[in-house]
Amino acid sequence: MTYNILHRTLYEYAAPVTVSHHVARLEPRPTSMQSRESFSLKIFPEPTLRKERADYFGNQLCLFSIQEVHKKLEIITHSRVTVRREPPPAPETSPAWEEVAALFRDPVSPEVVEPYQFVFDSPQVRASFELADYALESFPKGTPLLVGARELTRRIFKDFKYDPKATTVATPLEEVVEKRRGVCQDFAHLGIACLRSLGLP
């Protein structure tokens, strides 16, 4: 299926701005599941400086600076993207989670170098023995990885309550686990932390 995508961002400032610096991450990335047929990015007013580069993950960035007085900034992109849909693998056919976790122990095999970086703790998502215990209820010995991941997701949905007033972007994961409530980002962090606690990316 091919999509024609129009994106428009408009900033209207309360007072004139003399200098502004921006990073736009708007260019669709070619992957095994999608190809970018065309892409254009227009910026008004015209930037004084403009540079494009790829970030660590291969996403295209447009860094630009407007160094003249302006009261509004408009960014318009047009993209044409073709998406290829493949049926997902049957969860039961995925390898046992222990086999996958073993791939990420030293020495790391060449085929897992890219996902290896996601095994480690990050500021918002840290592995713990408590989370490993919670995750192991979904990952008994020999459980296919995708079966366990689906069960973990189901349990998080059942065990935690969606509450937009319970957390902020800075709420530590430990507090989310203690309160058993939060929002989508908290539950995503929880799922990732559970997987990391088992040595999975």
Predicted regions and their residues:
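Acidic low-complexity segments
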Residues: 78, 85-157, 171-175
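Active-site neighborhood of thiol-dependent amide/isopeptide-bond enzymes
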Residues: 9, 77, 141, 145-201
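Flexible, active-site-adjacent loop/turn segments at secondary-structure boundaries
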Residues: 11, 15, 24, 39-41, ...
